[in-house]
A protein has these predicted regions:
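Short loop/turn motifs that initiate or flank beta-strands
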Residues: 1-170
Length: 170
């Protein structure tokens, strides 16, 4: 009803559209620190994600996201690009994600070489010393990732004693 007695107000049924709200960006995604594994893959933690533009009381979570370090090498506070962020949660159908990328940092620590094999001592003539010259041409590093290369920079060896003998321990 209107407030003017000179008019009758007639309401007509109609339809309206309610547009989705926009999440401008997702922040708070972190990457786990990890040990070197010859890849740029980063494991993400989305539990602390925050959604810029969410209506108070709505429930959103990160459905998917991928993380990549800029390179595979060891380092601290390395840049991690976060891509392909998508939303889930009870109220996710009410939102469009404007920016599906983010960034963070994480550390890559050194990997361990489990063992080194293939280094042999060269036979020699008795000289009263225990020094052994080593052949490193066939060195193998157990724990080395495919595609990576390591070499032995220096190696020293000592015979268990200076006396002559066969199959002596070095």
């Amino acid at each position: 009803k209107g407030t003017d007695k000179n008019y009758d107000l007639t309401l007509v049924d109609g339809s309206l559209d309610i547009a989705k709200a926009k999440i401008n960006q997702v922040t708070g995604i972190t990457a786990d620190h990890r040990t070197y594994d010859a890849t740029t893959n980063a494991t993400l933690n989305t539990v602390t994600a925050q959604f810029e533009g969410i209506v108070v009381g709505d429930q959103l979570t990160v459905a998917t996201a991928t993380g990549k370090f800029n390179d595979k090498n060891v380092g601290t506070a390395k840049h991690v690009a976060i891509n392909n962020i998508s939303l889930s949660g009870t109220d996710s159908n009410n939102y469009d994600l404007v920016k599906n990328t983010a960034q963070t940092t994480a550390n890559i620590g050194k990997a361990n070489i489990n063992s080194i094999t293939g280094i042999t001592a060269n036979s020699r003539v008795y000289d009263g010393l225990t020094d052994a010259s080593l052949n490193i041409a066939n060195t193998q590093f157990n724990g080395l990732y495919s595609g990576d290369q390591l070499t032995v920079a220096t190696a020293t060896g000592q015979f268990e004693s200076a006396s002559t003998g066969q199959n002596k321990t070095v």
